[in-house]
Curated annotation (Swiss-Prot):
One of its GO terms (biological process) is glycolytic process. The lineage of its organism: Bacteria, Thermotogati, Deinococcota, Deinococci, Deinococcales. Keywords: Glycolysis, Isomerase. Catalyzes the interconversion of 2-phosphoglycerate and 3-phosphoglycerate. This is Probable 2,3-bisphosphoglycerate-independent phosphoglycerate mutase.
Length: 410
């Protein structure tokens, strides 16, 4: 454990208070023009504004100054795990999130379906975000075309939209390495990269990846839009200290997308079933309400604030923020002792990608001070009395506000 996590573990105590952590994925943004507003500031959010007026605000750097967090490191940081110490690839998170069991030596990989043009140039890294039904159809094609490579069993799984997972099953006594460069260049207008092993133990896996990419393009050659694959986030089986053991909290995850459910599962949270598709807002509220008495801590995830930012759709990201604002009163009706609203990273529509900008943080509790803030925005958060903090500081703050930490020292 990191020093802070180990210290908190020694101070944590069980109480009846409840903590609700709302993660608006990628919520931080940028104005489109010099004097413009961010997506958060543009959105009409009367309920978030009212909550901000009863709260303390601040900012979090999830990994470190200038470092752009992936979703995995961003969430680990929010949960109190040092993301530089506890490292996991997106492949394992997605695999575990959809219920795939990984064995020692296996390697899981997160894939994107992509659109390739002449000369294999990437036209769209997400293939137009195909429907889940189309995703399943493409996965079936790949399963039929690539059941194994050089004696290594290959399993392909659907995730959602453009996302899929591939698991390479290690032969007996021959563990596969996962230290490999990404195939996904994360930009358009260039060819997919060649996977390169970063250590000798990963050379076989890199060869498997490159062979899969080539065979997939052959298998999908008749597809007008979903005709290529991009890989990133290779991972073997990760192990983390138990969230419950560290914080004395019985914790539940309410999320729709497999990667986030996978991460919650890996740290020991119970993943609650959610009715509905995509962000399934009402289904999430229902899951929260029906399980409120059973848990001390709830992780409540909203995805589309991130997806719309990655699409560069400023107006739609504003709309998704406003949809959450309409939902917020139903969360507050449950009267959590502590509620936090935060992002796992920023995803400005202007950049169409994750960014290094700090994420705005709001904490309301019965024992917290109030800031003069009028709204939950990046600008108000930058002036907040919580200041600019490292991501793993969040959980101790929530625990303290819930009166779940004993005093340190005499």
């Amino acid at each position: 454990m990191s020093d802070l996590l180990d210290t908190v573990r020694g101070l944590a105590k069980k109480t009846d208070s409840k903590i609700l952590m709302v993660v608006l994925d990628g919520v931080g943004g940028l104005p489109l023009t010099v004097n413009g507003d961010t997506e958060l500031a543009t959105a009409r959010t009367p309920n978030l504004d009212a909550l901000a007026q009863e709260s303390q605000l601040g900012q979090l750097e999830l990994v470190g100054a200038g470092i752009t967090p992936g979703s995995g490191p961003g969430h680990l940081s929010l949960f109190g795990y040092d993301p530089l110490k506890y490292v996991v690839g997106r492949g394992a998170l997605s695999a575990v999130g959809i219920g795939v069991k990984l064995n020692r030596g296996d390697v899981a990989v997160r894939g994107n379906f992509a659109t390739l043009g002449a000369g294999r140039l990437i036209l769209d890294r997400r293939a137009g975000r195909p429907s889940d039904e189309k995703n399943a159809e493409i996965v079936a094609k790949l399963r039929a075309a690539i059941p194994e490579i050089d004696g290594v069993a290959v399993e392909v799984y659907t995730e959602s939209e453009h996302r899929f997972v591939v698991v390479f099953r290690a032969p007996e006594g021959q563990p596969l390495g996962a230290n490999i460069s990404d195939v996904d260049p994360q930009v358009t207008g260039v060819e997919p990269k060649t996977a390169i092993a970063n250590d000798p133990s990963s050379e076989v896996t890199a060869g498997l990846i490159n062979t899969f990419v080539a065979r997939a393009e052959v298998a999908l050659a008749d597809e007008p839009q979903v005709n290529g694959v991009l890989f990133r986030g290779y991972s073997d089986v990760p192990h983390f200290p138990s969230f419950e053991d560290a914080y004395q909290l019985k914790a539940a995850c309410i999320a729709s997308y497999p990667m986030y459910k996978g991460l919650a599962s890996l740290v020991g949270m119970d993943v609650l079933p959610v009715e509905g598709h995509e962000d399934a807002l009402e289904g999430k509220v229902k899951a929260l309400r029906e399980n409120w008495a059973k848990y001390d801590f709830f992780y409540f995830h909203i995805k589309k604030t991130d997806s719309t930012g990655e699409d560069g759709d400023f107006a739609e990201k504003v709309h998704k923020i406003e949809l959450f604002d309409e939902l917020l009163p139903q969360l507050l009706e449950l009267q959590p002792d502590v509620i936090a609203v935060v992002g796992d990273h920023s995803t400005p529509s202007k950049l169409k990608s994750h960014s290094w900008h700090p994420v705005p943080l709001l904490i309301r509790s019965n024992y917290g001070r109030r800031d003069p803030a009028q709204r939950y925005t990046e600008e108000e958060a930058a002036r907040g009395t919580l200041g600019l903090r490292h991501g793993p500081d969040l959980m101790p703050l929530l625990m303290a506000n819930a009166l779940k930490l004993n005093k340190y020292g005499a």
